[in-house]
From Swiss-Prot:
SMART domains: ARM (SM00185). This is Armadillo segment polarity protein. The gene is arm. It is found in: Cytoplasm; Cell membrane; Cell junction, Adherens junction. GO terms for biological process: anatomical structure morphogenesis; canonical Wnt signaling pathway; cell adhesion; neuroblast fate commitment; segment polarity determination. Disulfide bonds: none annotated. The keyword Cytoplasm applies. Belongs to the beta-catenin family. InterPro entries: ARM-like (IPR011989), ARM-type_fold (IPR016024), Armadillo (IPR000225), Beta-catenin (IPR013284). ARM repeats lie at residues 149-188, 191-231, 233-272, 275-314, 359-397, 398-437, 440-481, 487-527, 597-636, 638-677. May associate with CadN and participate in the transmission of developmental information. Can associate with alpha-catenin. Accumulates through wg signaling; arm function in wg signal transduction is required early in development for determination of neuroblast fate. Arm and Abl proteins function cooperatively at adherens junctions in both the CNS and epidermis. It comes from Drosophila pseudoobscura pseudoobscura. Its main location: cytoplasm. Residues 765-792 are annotated as: Disordered. GO terms for cellular component: adherens junction; cytoplasm; plasma membrane.
Length: 832
């Protein structure tokens, strides 16, 4: 039974009475009488007035008293009155056990078993004063005990180390084994562990025991000791200086799991914290052994191994090549496919991320199925794992443009674009940009899973973050050209309110790489007639002309500088972008926009036709081609044709009829044809003769060995010069003379739909593939009859066999070319 002096108790009556402090020398009998006078026992309420309050009308207890945990009922604590003898006994018991209570609180281990000590604690949640004071004393006692034990351990180890070193060097393997196990036990205590690591002779003896002993138990004990030492920097240094790394690497071939664990964790600690360890592990052949260990199935063990590989491979090309030669990519991809332990997946993805920047490892990872394996974890709940997978996928994506079976990855990437993490969105946009480059299947897949809508929203939400907008714009540029759903994508950008945002990206402070991508996207969007008016209303033509003038001025200044100094300076660059690329891109976009009459009128008002004419003299054939193309569209209007002629375009256009670039020659012929519509018959006759002569010039050279400025993949043996002839014959074939039997005269209104790609080489501004192989032309491709000249442009042209003797042209009419935009310049579908 707990007892609490009256002075420390809280009464439950409304009229509380606290007696004055008792004199220090009052007998127990007098104290009892005073307690009785103070109504602590059997109070009737007459003397104290404790129950004289008016009872509640509701008959309920006071709400405040009802919920107060400190209130208590005296009748419960004292069910009956105590006699004087009982009170004396209680006082005597408390007095006699006071020292025992103090001892129990401060030194409980000194009490004898079976002794019951009365407690003075009334509330279990409130410790007594003695209990509160005992906490610091217990801490002090434990500190003293630990200090004594530490000192004992240190002294013991210091005295034992010399003898243990001798035993470790003994020739008897049994002695060595016993000594190694003893040292291992000592290393488990901090004091003796410090004594061991402070002894270079002891660490060296342990390393020798590992290297020379064939006994598994002694090896296990010795490497276990090194493992314990490796948790301290001083121990790591001692192991490194004693030549422990080669010995530990050797143990990576051990068949014993515990030895392997000790060895790999010790090496891991060395690689993390000890300078020089990386090179030592490489020289000892550790990389090869670690790659071999990847075949094991213990996930925690594999996590340590992969982390070691990441440390060794990071920033070291030689290590990456060693991992490749040892079959590392295949094993790492297997781990990503086979396990779900987050830490293992994270460490493995870190290794793959390091290897993915190596040009040699990149295709190996892709071939091993790395893209699909990494895609499996894009929905993982671990942000760090998802981030590593995305970075790795982005690094690999430029080598995976021809990989099939990426539908699940593409769908996941489209979903990831909705993330609020800037890094995640940046990676996803970059991966989509690379995987949709020149891959029609991936383009169609992304469009079908809502990729266009997601990319437009991404661009809108990105604001001025060019690390997001640039890859997103590039991805849209790819999706809007050269695949079955490209027209749907072109419309989807407009329907998702993306045109205004895209045009605004042409404004400052956008940098040139982003501007270049936007120009290509606008050019592709203009292929959809429904986009012509919105693009014009959002100011696309004005900004394209502004950029063209700026880039043209930069290139002209560069030309003048070269002419003045005579030096061969490189082309004008800005943020890594050649200004010639901007010239080509803007003129190409204006070329497509000029297919619409209102756009042609606006372009004429910009006073930019003189620049187009001057670009006909440019040494870069791609620029000549787009310049001739936009002039071809502008010449469809009488006003445009007159301005072109006034700017002196007839001369350069006539010269370009002799160009070895098929597109340039064809556009030049078309412009001259349109300019001649209002000319006298004599002028038309002279132009007809000029065209005939240009086609028949150096006939043998053209058909045998002429260099058309095309890449080897686009040249077809001795027939390489025939494509330009086919194009020109197509343009001028329909005449009263009916050079090709079976073709009816068609009304000609415009060149809309004619799209002539530039071939590779010949001074192309971008250096990208400019043509599309006929094998990939799609359903629009037409195979010429046997013996007829072939061309990469045959997919857009449907012509019969050519009568080589009928080479007369009548300039009264020109047919409308087929409206097929599959064969576009590759400048608009690259990731450059």
């Amino acid at each position: 039974m707990s007892y609490m002096p009256a002075q420390n108790r809280t009464m439950s009556h409304n009229n509380q009475y606290n007696p004055p402090d008792l004199p220090p020398m009052v007998s127990a009998k007098e104290q009892t009488l005073m307690w009785q006078q103070n109504s602590y026992l059997g109070d009737s309420g007459i003397h104290s007035g404790a129950v004289t309050q008016v009872p509640s009308l509701s008959g309920k207890e006071d709400e405040e008293m009802e919920g107060d945990p400190l209130m208590f009922d005296l009748d419960t604590g004292f069910p009956q009155n105590f006699t004087q003898d009982q009170v004396d006994d209680m006082n005597q018991q408390l007095s006699q056990t006071r020292s025992q209570r103090v001892r129990a609180a401060m030194f409980p281990e000194t009490l004898e078993e079976g002794i019951e000590i009365p407690s003075t604690q009334f509330d279990p949640q409130q410790p007594t004063a003695v209990q509160r004071l005992s906490e610091p004393s217990q801490m002090l006692k434990h500190a003293v005990v630990n200090l004594i034990n530490y000192q004992d351990d240190a002294e013991l180890a210091t005295r034992a180390i010399p003898e243990l070193i001798k035993l470790l060097n003994d020739e008897d393997q049994v002695v060595v084994s016993q000594a190694a196990m003893m040292v291992h036990q000592l290393s488990k205590k901090e004091a003796s562990r410090h004594a061991i690591m402070n002894s270079p002779q002891m660490v060296a003896a342990l390393v020798r025991a590992i290297s020379n002993s064939n006994d598994l138990e002694s090896t296990k004990a010795a490497v276990g000791t090194l493992h314990n030492l490796s948790h301290h920097r001083q121990g790591l240094l001692a192991i490194f200086k004693s030549g422990g790394i080669p010995a530990l690497v050797k143990l990576l071939s051990s068949p014993v799991e515990s030895v392997l664990f000790y060895a790999i964790t010790t090496l891991h600690n060395l690689l993390l914290h000890q300078d020089g360890s990386k090179m030592a592990v490489r020289l000892a052949g550790g990389l090869q052994k670690m790659v071999t260990l990847l075949q094991r199935n213990n996930v925690k063990f594999l996590a340590i191994v992969t982390d070691c590989l990441q440390i060794l491979a990071y920033g070291n090309q030689e290590s990456k090549l060693i991992i490749l030669a040892s079959g590392g990519p295949n094993e790492l991809v297997r781990i990503m496919r086979s396990y779900d332990y987050e830490k293992l997946l994270w460490t493995t993805s870190r290794v793959l991320k390091v290897l993915s920047v190596c040009s040699s490892n990149k295709p190996a990872i892709v071939d091993a199925g790395g893209m699909q394996a990494l895609a499996m974890h894009l929905g993982n709940m671990s942000p760090r794992l998802v981030q590593n997978c995305l970075w790795t996928l982005r690094n690999l994506s430029d080598a995976a443009t021809k990989v099939e079976g990426l539908e699940a990855l593409l769908q996941s990437l489209v979903q990831v674009l909705g993330s609020t993490d800037v890094n995640v969105v940046t990676c996803a946009a970059g991966i989509l940009s690379n995987l949709t480059c020149n891959n029609q299947r991936n383009k169609a897949t992304v469009c079908q899973v809502g990729g266009v809508d997601a990319l437009v929203r991404t661009i809108i939400n990105a604001g001025d973050r060019e690390e997001i907008t640039e890859p997103a714009v590039c991805a849209l540029r790819h999706l809007t050209s050269r695949h079955v759903d490209s027209e749907l994508a072109q419309n989807a950008v407009r329907l998702n309110y993306g045109l205004s945002v895209i045009v605004k990206l042409l404004h400052p402070p956008s940098r040139w790489p982003l501007i270049k991508a936007v120009i290509g996207l606008i050019r592709n969007l203009a292929l959809c007639p429904a986009n012509h008016a919105p693009l014009r209303e959002h100011g696309a033509i004005h900004h394209l002309v502004r950029l063209l003038m700026r880039a043209f001025q930069d290139t002209e200044r560069q030309r003048s500088s070269i002419a003045t100094t005579g030096s061969q300076q490189p082309s004008a660059y800005a943020d890594g972008v050649r200004m010639e690329e901007i010239v080509e891109g803007t003129v190409g976009a204006l070329h497509i926009l000029a297919r619409e009459s209102h756009n042609r009128a606006l372009i004429r008002q910009q006073s930019v036709i003189p620049i187009f004419v001057r670009l006909l003299f440019n040494e870069i054939e791609n620029i000549q081609r787009v310049a001739a193309g936009v002039l071809c569209e502008l010449a469809a209007d009488k006003e445009g044709a007159e301005i072109i002629e006034q700017e002196g375009a007839t001369g350069p256009l006539t010269d370009l009829l002799h160009s070895r670039n098929e597109g340039v020659a064809t556009y030049a012929a078309a412009v001259l044809f349109r300019m001649s519509e209002d000319k006298p018959q004599d002028y038309k006759k002279r132009l007809s003769i000029e065209l005939t002569n240009s086609l028949l010039r150096e006939d043998n050279n053209i058909w045998a060995n002429a260099d058309l400025g095309m890449g080897p993949d686009l040249q077809v043996g001795s027939l390489q010069g025939a494509s330009a002839l086919i194009l020109l014959l197509y343009i001028f074939s329909i005449s009263p003379y009916r050079l090709f039997a079976g073709y009816d005269t068609l009304p000609i209104d415009s060149m809309q739909g004619l799209e002539i790609s530039s071939p590779v080489g010949g001074g192309g501004a971008t250096g990208n593939s400019g043509g599309v192989n006929s094998a990939s032309a799609g359903s629009g491709a037409v195979v010429p009859p046997s013996g007829a000249p072939t061309s990469p442009y045959s997919m857009d042209m449907d012509v019969g066999e050519i009568d080589a003797g009928a080479l007369n042209f009548d300039l009264d009419a020109m047919p409308t070319p087929p409206n097929d935009n599959n064969n576009l310049a590759a400048w608009y579908d690259t990731d450059c």
